[in-house]
């Protein structure tokens, strides 16, 4: 069975990825099982950061590695927080602190346009020197709610309003969210490619 390292320390993200990839005949192993340390995300795009993380995990383990870099972009904030989504309120900030900073920044800006999108870029590298990593990209369009709502999900989910469902991402159950989310889209692309490539 093919083994692929999941290059993330984020337990919530890992759980989503493993759930969405469960039907593949591939063994996905969290990098924590190899004691792979985090690497600084120095890229200026989601693609660059995903590749940095995948390359690092592949180098440390000698196995193919899959990395996800995701973030929230908000039109009124010139696409912020973007690649800094997880560090928007400081390196060790909580989800609640990041959400509060976004709401305060929007209040200070012209918040008549509250459109936003979640992006997820997945990079799969066969080895650390893979010159052509597989890249999958999902985008989830929505709006920023005026206050947090819902208990599900993680990150900015409580303020990401999904007009088609008239609820925030945190008010969707996990199955609903995975069917339409940015990560769900990117992993669906990945699943299709892996199935065709490896006949898994």
UniProtKB/Swiss-Prot annotation:
Substrate binds at residues 8-13, 70, 154-157, 177, 182-183. The active site is at 69 (proton acceptor). GO terms for molecular function: dITP diphosphatase activity; ITP diphosphatase activity; metal ion binding; nucleoside triphosphate diphosphatase activity; nucleotide binding; ribonucleoside triphosphate phosphatase activity; XTP diphosphatase activity. It comes from the Bacteria. Pyrophosphatase that catalyzes the hydrolysis of nucleoside triphosphates to their monophosphate derivatives, with a high preference for the non-canonical purine nucleotides XTP (xanthosine triphosphate), dITP (deoxyinosine triphosphate) and ITP. Seems to function as a house-cleaning enzyme that removes non-canonical purine nucleotides from the nucleotide pool, thus preventing their incorporation into DNA/RNA and avoiding chromosomal lesions. Homodimer. NCBIfam families: PRK14822.1 (NF011397), RdgB/HAM1 family non-canonical purine NTP pyrophosphatase (TIGR00042). This is dITP/XTP pyrophosphatase. It comes from Coxiella burnetii (strain RSA 493 / Nine Mile phase I).
